[in-house]
Amino acid sequence: MNLQQQLAYCQQHQQRLQLRHFDNETAWQLGEKIKRQAEKQGVALAIDITVNHQTLFSYAMAGTCAENQDWLRRKRNVVELLSTSSYAAGLMLQQRETSLDARYGVSLRDYAALGGAFPLQIKQAGIIGSVNVSGAPHLDDHNLLLQVLADFVGLPTGSIELLTPLTPLSA
């Protein structure tokens, strides 16, 4: 899958993975679902769900460390800045051959355009926050969120195309 294809999928994902409503109880349910999926996949994740700058769910699985919490913060900051997933932001920067600090003047100590943070978007209302994970390779973090969110919003299993490592454009 090349860069253009991945960007197109990221746009589709953000359109399809919208919620009807979201509250503190929803955050708890989503966070628990992410934890169960991580356990199934055998990965240890730090999980954070933030709405309007308030943390509604936070959990650090055994095997994570303080560094994972920092990655959560940096990825979440990208979602808040650009209103797109942290993975899609990284792809857009690659496409433009630039970086977060060069394009937006932000510190890379505070922002990370790597997979693992996804906007929480309410249908016909907009983005209210983000769901964030850290602990696996960043593409795996992103795909785990896609899987869980697809199930959470009631999409049929397999209806969301998971992303694969980038391949160069053929000549």
Curated annotation (Swiss-Prot):
Alphabetical list of InterPro entries matching this protein: PduO/GlcC-like, PduO/GlcC-like_sf, YBR137W-like
Pfam families in UniProt: HbpS-like
NCBIfam families per the UniProt record, alphabetical: PRK02487.1-3, PRK02487.1-5
PANTHER family: PTHR28255, UPF0303 PROTEIN YBR137W
Family: Belongs to the UPF0303 family.
Protein name as it appears in the record: UPF0303 protein YPO2534/y1653/YP_2345
Source species of the chain: Yersinia pestis
